[in-house]
């Protein structure tokens, strides 16, 4: 059993998160009203305003929305199996094995959205599909919340299953602490699978959340057009930036197999709720706001937001590509000139290029891109800036987890490395 070095504040912290995240995810959307986002009276009477925008509990659920969410997941599973796929291997597990993964998230995206685009061209912007998503947004979100917690419970109970002699369930080092609340949040089993190929964590890591994010962005864009008769430059930029981000992730699906989500974290509420609810329903907050309150940026505004986006992406993708190229082949001409430090374990840590600037410089680029999404909404509401604040906190927390993991892995070599690469995320500041 793992030690009691709990994550996320231990049983109390994870328990609180599991209680408050679902209502937070709902209320940020409830507060976008026809009179403002939030309505003017919120600042003088927040509790009364929250009460007034709260729908009845029963109205948050519907059978058709639940069936729609189920159909969405079944479709993604079917496309994962049916479409051509790159077969990639994961990292070596503690039993010496390496799992194989079907990587075709990008192809799935192309097939899925090509179909939706074709239907929209044929049926026009009044096609029922788009209005269904926006009119039943809260019900779809509630169904996804229930699904994520139910799936979390199933994989948690399943992690205790007996195994044939000589085999064992491979558990997550951070989700195997012996406390049910904490382990339920973190995820006890590392790589739960159904059959040989259906890796439940891989399925959720990119597909339902990221594709759902773009799906709702487009739905709110159609809503803006049907309501106001135009599509604003701001919502076009939101769609371009966020679709770009998603496509980049889907295209690089095999590279996700070496990230902490896959190699270290178990599959629990944190990843399942995050990918089934938080990403698709919270990350579309900018498009949701702009559907009701269009913002016209003009040429100068567009240029400014584009500059922020391109700067962030150059750092984010440049750093990640450099790291992946070095890991794959240090002799590659693109990275062979980079300086590195060799640890006692034989690992090589980059100390020049992007990775000589900061130890997690890719997080800095990611956060800059988050600013570009929020800036498209102007400065008339704080709600749409929730994303950049939350994302900054997330990256700081992930940085601390990464640092602890690396210090445990490399020991004194990590201290030596930190003296060379002094900054953690933002050079000169942090």
UniProtKB/Swiss-Prot annotation:
Annotated membrane topology: Multi-pass membrane protein
GO biological process: ergosterol biosynthetic process
Pfam family, one: ERG4_ERG24
Pathway: Steroid biosynthesis; zymosterol biosynthesis; zymosterol from lanosterol: step 2/6
Swiss-Prot/TrEMBL keywords: Lipid biosynthesis, Lipid metabolism, Membrane, NADP, Oxidoreductase, Steroid biosynthesis, Steroid metabolism, Sterol biosynthesis, Sterol metabolism, Transmembrane, Transmembrane helix
Binding site for NADP(+): 323, 327, 350, 355, 362-363, 402, 406-410, 417
Family note: Belongs to the ERG4/ERG24 family.
Record function comment: Reduces the C14=C15 double bond of 4,4-dimethyl-cholesta-8,14,24-trienol to produce 4,4-dimethyl-cholesta-8,24-dienol.
Positions of transmembrane segments: 12-32, 67-87, 109-129, 230-250, 267-287, 290-310, 349-369, 376-396
Compartments reported by the entry: Membrane
Bridged cysteine pairs (disulfide): none
UniProt-recorded name of the protein: Delta(14)-sterol reductase
E.C. numbers: 1.3.1.70
Catalyzed reaction equations: 4,4-dimethyl-5alpha-cholesta-8,24-dien-3beta-ol + NADP(+) = 4,4-dimethyl-5alpha-cholesta-8,14,24-trien-3beta-ol + NADPH + H(+)
Single Gene Ontology MF annotation: NADP binding
Cellular component terms (Gene Ontology): endoplasmic reticulum membrane
Phylogenetic lineage: Eukaryota, Fungi, Dikarya, Ascomycota, Pezizomycotina
Main location: membrane
């Amino acid at each position: 059993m793992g030690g009691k070095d709990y994550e996320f504040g231990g049983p109390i912290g994870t328990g609180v998160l599991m209680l408050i995240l679902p209502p937070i995810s709902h209320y940020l959307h409830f507060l976008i009203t026809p009179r403002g986002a939030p309505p003017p009276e919120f600042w003088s009477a927040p509790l009364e305003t929250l009460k007034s925008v709260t729908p009845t509990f029963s109205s948050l659920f519907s059978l058709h929305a639940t069936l729609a969410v189920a159909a969405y997941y079944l479709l993604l599973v079917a496309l994962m199996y049916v479409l051509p796929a790159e077969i990639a291997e994961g990292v070596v597990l503690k039993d010496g094995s390496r799992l194989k993964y079907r990587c075709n998230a990008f192809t799935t995206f192309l097939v899925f959205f090509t179909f939706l685009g074709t239907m929209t061209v044929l049926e026009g912007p009044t096609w029922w599909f788009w209005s269904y998503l926006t009119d039943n947004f809260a019900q779809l979100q509630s169904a996804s919340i229930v699904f994520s917690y139910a799936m979390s419970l199933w994989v948690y109970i399943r992690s205790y299953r007996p195994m044939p002699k000589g085999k064992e369930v491979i558990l997550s080092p951070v989700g195997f602490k012996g406390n049910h609340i904490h382990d339920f949040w973190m995820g006890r089993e590392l790589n739960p699978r159904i059959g040989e190929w259906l890796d439940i964590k891989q399925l959720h890591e990119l597909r339902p959340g990221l594709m759902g994010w773009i799906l709702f962005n487009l739905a709110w864009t159609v809503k803006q057009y049907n309501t106001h008769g135009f599509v604003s430059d701001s919502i076009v930029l939101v769609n371009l930036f966020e679709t770009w981000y998603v496509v980049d992730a889907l295209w690089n699906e095999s590279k996700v197999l070496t990230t902490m989500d896959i190699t270290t974290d178990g599959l629990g509420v944190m990843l399942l709720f995050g990918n089934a609810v938080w990403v698709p329903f919270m990350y579309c907050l900018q498009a949701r706001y702009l559907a009701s309150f269009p913002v016209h940026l003009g040429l100068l505004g567009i240029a400014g937001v584009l500059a922020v986006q391109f700067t962030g992406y150059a750092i984010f993708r440049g750093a990640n590509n450099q790291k992946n190229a070095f890991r794959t082949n240090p002799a590659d001409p693109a990275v062979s000139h980079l300086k590195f430090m060799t640890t006692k374990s034989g690992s090589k840590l980059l100390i020049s290029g992007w990775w000589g600037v900061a130890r997690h410089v890719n997080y800095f680029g990611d956060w800059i891109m988050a600013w570009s999404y929020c800036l498209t909404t102007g400065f008339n509401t704080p709600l749409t800036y929730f994303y950049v604040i939350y994302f900054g906190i997330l990256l700081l927390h992930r940085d601390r987890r990464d640092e602890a993991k690396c210090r445990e892995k490399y020991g004194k070599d990590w201290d030596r490395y930190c003296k060379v690469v002094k900054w953690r995320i933002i050079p000169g500041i942090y």
